[in-house]
């Protein structure tokens, strides 16, 4: 039998106390972060977000790399955005948006299998609400930790806000190119018209851009964009909008 000295016992107790303390600090910080997110979302029930995490990061990069450049963004009410664009985005990004709870389990499982096969994260299976959660609070980093936080924020959004409000914030904050955010800025940047006047074909082409907005901004008029837009345009008629629409 090996005797344990008093010094060793004291060291073990100290390490245990330190672990408990560190765990408590981490748990407290995590909880405070979640409460901050929840409070922000509750505020956005009646106040429009001024910016998003993506916008702030992009603004910093633009000021560093091309100082005269600025973020293009103009908030417009939900009813001042073309129904064509709303239908195009639902047809392209989240066909069950109006009725789902913010998650598409089948898409998440498919993304998991794809990521496992590739040995890295290449797909996320994100719904419109999940995309909004990421845009508002998180980064472009691809990791399972970030994905877990995204799922928590998605639950908060779906619990606190109704579908129309979620879609309104999404439409006004999603990225559509280098420094271009929201439907109004995108409509004026690409077509020189307000978002309320976007036609079906214009809306379908904008919807194609969302997975890789900066790439499509730099490669406008690509054959793929036209082909994919045609597919989205055919699906738009079946796209179900939030109830009030």
From Swiss-Prot:
Q: For this protein, what reaction is catalysed?
A: [GlcNAc-(1->4)-Mur2Ac(oyl-L-Ala-gamma-D-Glu-L-Lys-D-Ala-D-Ala)](n)-di-trans,octa-cis-undecaprenyl diphosphate + beta-D-GlcNAc-(1->4)-Mur2Ac(oyl-L-Ala-gamma-D-Glu-L-Lys-D-Ala-D-Ala)-di-trans,octa-cis-undecaprenyl diphosphate = [GlcNAc-(1->4)-Mur2Ac(oyl-L-Ala-gamma-D-Glu-L-Lys-D-Ala-D-Ala)](n+1)-di-trans,octa-cis-undecaprenyl diphosphate + di-trans,octa-cis-undecaprenyl diphosphate + H(+)
Q: What is this protein called?
A: Biosynthetic peptidoglycan transglycosylase
Metabolic or biological pathway: Cell wall biogenesis; peptidoglycan biosynthesis
Transmembrane domains' residue ranges: 20-42
Family from the record: Belongs to the glycosyltransferase 51 family.
Task: Tell me how this protein sits in the membrane.
Answer: Single-pass membrane protein
Transmembrane helix found in the keyword field: yes
According to its UniProt record, the EC number is 2.4.99.28
UniProt function note? Peptidoglycan polymerase that catalyzes glycan chain elongation from lipid-linked precursors.
Q: Name one GO biological process term.
A: peptidoglycan biosynthetic process
Q: Which UniProt keywords apply?
A: Cell inner membrane, Cell membrane, Cell shape, Cell wall biogenesis/degradation, Glycosyltransferase, Membrane, Peptidoglycan synthesis, Transferase, Transmembrane, Transmembrane helix
Compartments annotated for it: namely:
Cell inner membrane
Gene symbol here is: mtgA
Tell me the GO molecular function terms: pentosyltransferase activity; peptidoglycan glycosyltransferase activity
Q: Record's superkingdom?
A: Bacteria
Q: Name one GO cellular component term.
A: plasma membrane
Does this UniProt record's set of keywords contain Electron transport?
Answer: no
Tell me the InterPro entries matching this sequence.
Answer: Glyco_trans_51, Lysozyme-like_dom_sf, PBP_transglycosylase, Pep_trsgly
